[in-house]
Amino acid sequence: MSYKMFGRCRTACFRSPNLFAANKGMPLQASVAGGASRYIIGTASVLVGAMAGFYIMNSRSAIHEYVSCPLVRLVTPDAEDGHKLGIWFLKYGLAPKLMFDKDDPVLKVEVFGKTMSNPIGCAAGLDKDGEAIDGIAQSGFGYVEIGTVTPLAQPGNPKPRFFRLPMDEAVINRYGFNSSGHKKVYDNVLSRVRQFLGAYFRDDTVNSLALYKDKLLGINLGKNKNGDEVEDYLRGVEKFQSLADVLVINVSSPNTPGLRDLQQEGRLTELLSMIVAKRNSLINEGNVLGASTHKPPVLVKIAPDLTEPELQSIAEAAKKSSIDGIIVSNTTIQRPDSLYTVDEELKNQAGGLSGKPVKPFALKALRTIHQYTKDTNLVLVGCGGISSGQDAIEFAKAGAHFVQLYTAYAYRGPGLIARIKDEVTEELRNEGKTWMEIIGQDAK
């Protein structure tokens, strides 16, 4: 292009009425001011959007307890639909997360030869098929338990089978071990392990199957409705030994006919002994992270509706079979007079009651079990009605090495976990103790 032609083009450009002004005749200064205003407004909008996004995705935000969770209950009159919606959000990373999750050292738990950064666990029943492990772990739990998983896929009991008692912050369920079965759940859990191992950036200090530093993954095993009461559990151990930090044997659901009969001392001792033998036979097969040996602890989950002699028998079965721990407890078939729910039909629905009203039963059973196991290495896990830091501390002082919850998480939202940890930390600091130092304190 010649110099003269370039000059003509340049002159034409600067004479263009629309190049620096939105309207004909607009002064250059006004155009610049308008552009600056638009830039400031745009930047502010982005910042406000980012702050709003951070607030919404931060589990500590009050909006989740007071708006999001009530809204979910409002749009899902059938509680099971609400359960499914919650899992969907957790599965696809849309649920709020505990930002900058760093646990106070006083919360550390040394258990099964491993470390948990905090003693708050998610109980089985929330993520039955291992679809949302990451979403749950990112709420701040130190332990995540999936299941119950049965060998074959089964639909469970007819619907409706899940009922809310909001005045009591409780639910009644009679799911009946609805499960996608061993193969599907195995594939779900293995898939995230493969993604972890294939990631370019990953934390090489992680040595737990939860795939998070100082967190553990438990897999809860059950039997099919018409399955063999021993073989079904052995198949579960064989299938999931390499994928679990902890294996849990569920013999206490009230919704599978005859299942609770397995809590009788003779039958339970035989069952647990065979499970431990199966676990031991697989130790040298290692785990999916490449460990040459792997020996996940075996825990049994029991009901809260047991007499002291029955609890003593379970303690004896646990000792004789050499399992590693007991989870106290599952749901209750009792309907205490303390329930605020006035709808007789609702509160007397068949199934297991969980949530706040279960706490007295679970705590009493835990204290009894601790009395008969305190001179052993058995690890006790408290579960039932825990919804605050004070609840967690009560269970610890009664003998629980760590605790689990589920129903309160559904009612209060993911921010509950941070709040419980904050409350426990504050109380421990006030007492000048650590979590490990208060375990069984009231029974000493």
Swiss-Prot record:
Matching Gene3D superfamilies: Aldolase class I
CC cofactor note: Binds 1 FMN per subunit.
Reported cofactor(s): FMN
Locations listed in the record: Mitochondrion inner membrane
Binding site for FMN: A124, G125, L126, D127, K128, T148, N220, N250, K301, S329, G355, G385, Y406, T407
Active site feature: S253 (nucleophile)
InterPro entries attached to this UniProt entry: Aldolase_TIM (IPR013785), DHO_dehydrogenase (IPR050074), Dihydroorotate_DH_2 (IPR005719), Dihydroorotate_DH_cat (IPR005720), Dihydroorotate_DH_CS (IPR001295)
Protein name as catalogued: Dihydroorotate dehydrogenase (quinone), mitochondrial
Taxon lineage: Eukaryota, Fungi, Dikarya, Ascomycota, Saccharomycotina
